[in-house]
Amino acid sequence: MAGDVGGRSCTDSELLLHPELLSQEFLLLTLEQKNIAVETDVRVNKDSLTDLYVQHAIPLPQRDLPKNRWGKMMEKKREQHEIKNETKRSSTVDGLRKRPLIVFDGSSTSTSIKVKKTENGDNDRLKPPPQASFTSNAFRKLSNSSSSVSPLILSSNLPVNNKTEHNNNDAKQNHDLTHRKSPSGPVKSPPLSPVGTTPVKLKRAAPKEEAEAMNNLKPPQAKRKIQHVTWP
């Protein structure tokens, strides 16, 4: 059973709370189902039927209790029940607001990836990798060797004839360069070492005469005298 109230559809439960909207026949039927005796005078008048319906058949807690000892006792029980319901609602709301404390251990993960915690984890991070230390030592050795003389070690896999020709050509080029730059005196070329046993020195040392000639070409700079300031 449904109806329209003020242009709004109402369900059966809403209509039961408003007996003035119900028909007289429906009120009589509900009262008879509740086994409530209805007099003939009350059946004719709808207002009396609605009052009887509100007093006995309307759904709780809208029912008006009688003003006797039993009615007062029921009102007290109703108030206590309402207070308990309010406390329960407030407790449930507080429980929903307070979020549980989530503790993540790492062991409760469902993934297959597991991180192992080591005792010296921080120290291991600070240590350089073994390759870095090896390369640093190699760079130091190379820098020390290149600062003095850079040796060129020839591979022994090449034929001997090619090695000797290459060494002779290098010696001739060095000899020609020294004669062009310093015609005043001959320059001793470094002795050639046997092939395959010792490295060949390709770096040519600067002659002493060239250094002296370069110093002579520089104009002599007169030393400036420092003039002391004297006050009268």
From Swiss-Prot:
<dbReference type="GO" id="GO:0005634">
    <property type="term" value="C:nucleus"/>
</dbReference>
<feature type="modified residue" description="Phosphoserine">
    <location>
        <position position="189"/>
    </location>
</feature>
<comment type="similarity">
    <text>Belongs to the ashwin family.</text>
</comment>
<keyword id="KW-0539">Nucleus</keyword>
<feature type="modified residue" description="Phosphoserine">
    <location>
        <position position="182"/>
    </location>
</feature>
<dbReference type="GO" id="GO:0048598">
    <property type="term" value="P:embryonic morphogenesis"/>
</dbReference>
<feature type="modified residue" description="Phosphoserine">
    <location>
        <position position="193"/>
    </location>
</feature>
<dbReference type="Pfam" id="PF15323">
    <property type="entry name" value="Ashwin"/>
</dbReference>
<feature type="compositionally biased region" description="Basic residues">
    <location>
        <begin position="221"/>
        <end position="232"/>
    </location>
</feature>
<feature type="region of interest" description="Disordered">
    <location>
        <begin position="157"/>
        <end position="232"/>
    </location>
</feature>
<feature type="modified residue" description="Phosphoserine">
    <location>
        <position position="184"/>
    </location>
</feature>
<feature type="modified residue" description="Phosphoserine">
    <location>
        <position position="112"/>
    </location>
</feature>
<dbReference type="GO" id="GO:0005654">
    <property type="term" value="C:nucleoplasm"/>
</dbReference>
<dbReference type="GO" id="GO:0006388">
    <property type="term" value="P:tRNA splicing, via endonucleolytic cleavage and ligation"/>
</dbReference>
<feature type="compositionally biased region" description="Basic and acidic residues">
    <location>
        <begin position="116"/>
        <end position="127"/>
    </location>
</feature>
<feature type="modified residue" description="Phosphothreonine">
    <location>
        <position position="197"/>
    </location>
</feature>
<dbReference type="InterPro" id="IPR024887">
    <property type="entry name" value="Ashwin"/>
</dbReference>
<feature type="modified residue" description="Phosphothreonine">
    <location>
        <position position="198"/>
    </location>
</feature>
<feature type="region of interest" description="Disordered">
    <location>
        <begin position="113"/>
        <end position="136"/>
    </location>
</feature>
<comment type="subunit">
    <text>Component of the tRNA-splicing ligase complex.</text>
</comment>
<keyword id="KW-0597">Phosphoprotein</keyword>
<protein>
    <recommendedName>
        <fullName>Ashwin</fullName>
    </recommendedName>
</protein>
<dbReference type="GO" id="GO:0072669">
    <property type="term" value="C:tRNA-splicing ligase complex"/>
</dbReference>
<dbReference type="GO" id="GO:0005737">
    <property type="term" value="C:cytoplasm"/>
</dbReference>
<feature type="modified residue" description="Phosphoserine">
    <location>
        <position position="143"/>
    </location>
</feature>
<feature type="compositionally biased region" description="Basic and acidic residues">
    <location>
        <begin position="163"/>
        <end position="179"/>
    </location>
</feature>
